[in-house]
Structures are given as structure tokens and as C-alpha cells.
């Protein structure tokens, strides 16, 4: 009788240990990307693009009130992708056209300027710099945040970045235009 009871408890203990190990693995896998910087996550995704895409980093632009840089500009036959990055942690909420958005997470509530508007400033500056009518496609990449509201197709999580590029397949620029853009942006 004692042997049956002890075997019973050993089975229960083993089952609980396996269950605990699975829970720990599940929780750790959800946070593995938090150990990687947002810039590195975006860079890894952009490195997966094929040879049709030329990725330029930290493109310097002149704004109305000084200078700034665009984290990434991707030149391709399908357009010029203007990639801004948002590295905030937590849940992001707000209205697509609102000036400010809310970030809630880990006991901290903060307000940020609308990243879509910031990206629009980059596009306006690029239009002036390129001095041509070219297809500029905005994309704001959120690396560690969950988007609570729908901010439109230009706001994507880092995991959807490849899909975003795959959705743009219509050829809009020739090679001569691409090379001219790359030359201007590298100045």
C-alpha cells in the first residue's frame, strides 16, 4: 500500500516538474527578443531582403529647424521605403491622426509624438532633397511594442516587416532612377 502511494506521488511530482519546465520555456521564449536591441532586430529583417533592395542607414536630411537622420531608406524598383523605428516597450494606443500617442507598460505611462507624423517629416525632407517626384513609401517599425489600435498599413511590428515589403511588388522605378537616388542620398 505504501509503495502505491509513493509511486503515485512521484508521478504527480514528475508531472508538476515537467509542467513547470514547460511554463518557464514558454515565458522565456516570449522575451528573447527583448534582449536584442530594436535597431538590431530591424537590421536583421532588412538584411533578409533580396538584391532588388538597397538599404541605406542613417541618411542625413535637412528639416525646417535643423538636421536629422532617417534610420533606414530602402531603395528598390518598387519605390523608396522610408523606414522609421519606434523602440518603445509596452502597449501603444492612440488615434492614427492624433499628435500624441500613449505608451503603457511596466508601470510607466508616457506620451510620445506620433511616429507616423515624424516619418512624414522625413518624407517631406527627402522630397526636397531628391527634387523629383518619386514614390516614397512610409513605414514605421515597432520593435518591442504591441499596437493596441489600428494605425494603418504603414505601422508594422518588426515581425511583419518582410510581409510589408512583399506587398509592394509593382515596379515604379527604373535602375537609372534608383542609382540617381542612391547617389544623392549618399552625399
For the regions a protein language model found, what residue spans apply to each?
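Surface-exposed interaction regions that form or flank ligand-binding interfaces
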Residues: 1-69, 74-80, 86-94, 100-187
